[in-house]
Amino acid sequence: MLLEFTYTKKEYADGWRRFFFLTKVIKKFDLVVMAFSLLIPLYLFYQYGFTRFYIMLAFVIYFFNIVIVAVFFIRPYMFYQEYEQLHHPYKLLFEDDKITFDAHAIHSTLSWDIYKHYMENKDYFYIIQKKRTYALIPKRIFASENELSAFRQLLTDHLTTP
């Protein structure tokens, strides 16, 4: 099965963020905790005033939240900009015994063994090599539900789901 596509910046960033949720690196509850943690310093300042300890605590909490926001929202876009090959068309040929990968300056033939399992959500397939190394396949590239099902079956024949 031949798949051809070009990532958009928004699509790549969206796939990156959704992978965090899919693999439970970040859970929705974590985002709620982050939002409430922003209120803690305000409450402490209101109740106890602007002491040195509470000011330092506020800096730590806000720094932590800024780092999480940067990793979750900004880093995917930066990664897309940094790697030129993400801007060019990808051609992936999935066969029973191998996967042929052709993208910009990268041409390689891989055995299925390089990948451990696959995951999917409503918009993407993630073909996972290591814990955080994966190939992102947008589902928008499939012309029909039959093609999508055939690709899913091909993945199921060669890989497991975690």
PLM region descriptions:
Residues 99, 108-125:
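Phosphoinositide-dependent membrane-docking surfaces
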Residues 1-40:
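N-terminal membrane-targeting/pre-transmembrane regions
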Residues 68-109:
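Conserved beta-hairpin
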Residues 106-109, 116-118, 132-135, 143:
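Short, surface-exposed beta-strand-loop junctions and turns on beta-sheet-rich folds
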Residues 126-162:
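A membrane-cytosol interface segment of integral membrane proteins
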